[in-house]
Amino acid sequence: MAREDSVRCLRCLLYALNLLFWLMSISVLGVSAWIRDYLNNVLTLTAETRVEEAVILTYFPVVHPVMIAVCCFLILVGMLGYCGTVKRNLLLLVWYFGSLLVIFCVELACGVWTYEQEITVPVQWSDMITLKARMTNYGLPRYQWLTHAWNFFQREFKCCGVVYFTDWLEMTEMDWPPDSCCVREFPGCSKQAHHEDLSDLYQEGCGKKMYTFLRGTKQLQVLRFLGISIGVTQILAMILTITLLWALYYDRRDPGADQIMSLKNDTSQQLSCHSVELLKPSLTGIFEHTSMANSFNTHFEMEEL
């Protein structure tokens, strides 16, 4: 009975952990898509520079192929574990444990690679010149992708130009920076800020922001947190799976152990009840003999009187 309760508890815990696997995997896929949007815009602006090379070396080998593949595989493994837990199938649970172990090793290797990989990209003036040279194509109909990338980066990272917002005036024929440089953006805000109050424009350039992007972003922090959480959950799931396998294996190897213990308890209770039943007649007889003796003595005393 105790073993059956333990198995039931282990199964409930594995159900909960598999649900966590699905939720975390979906979250990691969403964060990876979130990072991809940032990476596409950064790569558009930093093409043919050292920054582009650093971005590719830092993010793409781990963030996209490995993490996406691991999360998709983990969703399938969660289904495998769920089926094995429901059916109490030892083979499915063994496959589930082995798959979790392989995924954990891959995640551990990726985590070590990410933290050990230190890309040092010194700021070079040639990179700044390359970034400035692309500013001349801003707003042109055939360079809408570049216009979108500049606007996205300036809004998200709260910067303007490459070194300073005056880069837009130097490198283009514009009389004022784009509206995406405004602290409070609205149509015509940059023109108003240029003529009235320059503090309404972002004062920091986007060049250094791109290098800061390589040092770690909030998206990458969230991704690392989710990766660590998935790893801890996998360790717990593997421990519970081993325990459940042990319980199910010995339950099948000695299926009557609990039944024998239960039978012993029932037999003991029945013997106790039977002993009480056997004692009842003897106690009744003793009581009757005692009563008869007392009545006889009383009758004898009355005759003597």
From Swiss-Prot:
UniProt subunit comment: Component of a complex, at least composed of TSPAN12, FZD4 and norrin (NDP).
Family to which this protein belongs: Belongs to the tetraspanin (TM4SF) family.
Gene: TSPAN12
PTM statement from Swiss-Prot or TrEMBL: Palmitoylated; required for interaction with ADAM10. The precise position of palmitoylated residues is unclear and occurs either on Cys-9, Cys-12 and/or Cys-83.
Function: Regulator of cell surface receptor signal transduction. Plays a central role in retinal vascularization by regulating norrin (NDP) signal transduction. Acts in concert with norrin (NDP) to promote FZD4 multimerization and subsequent activation of FZD4, leading to promote accumulation of beta-catenin (CTNNB1) and stimulate LEF/TCF-mediated transcriptional programs.
Taxonomic placement: Eukaryota, Metazoa, Chordata, Craniata, Vertebrata
Extracellular side stretches: 34-59, 111-224
S-palmitoyl cysteine lipid modification positions: C9, C12, C83
Subcellular location(s) per record: Cell membrane
Species name: Gallus gallus (Chicken)
Chief localization: membrane
Membrane topology: Multi-pass membrane protein
Residue ranges crossing the lipid bilayer per the database entry: 13-33, 60-80, 90-110, 225-245
GO biological process, one term: cell surface receptor signaling pathway
SUPFAM superfamilies: Tetraspanin
Single GO cellular component term: plasma membrane
Cytoplasmic membrane side: 1-12, 81-89, 246-305
Keywords carried by this UniProt record: Angiogenesis, Cell membrane, Lipoprotein, Membrane, Palmitate, Transmembrane, Transmembrane helix
Record-given protein name: Tetraspanin-12
Alphabetical list of InterPro entries matching this protein: Tetraspanin/Peripherin (IPR018499), Tetraspanin_animals (IPR000301), Tetraspanin_CS (IPR018503), Tetraspanin_EC2_sf (IPR008952)
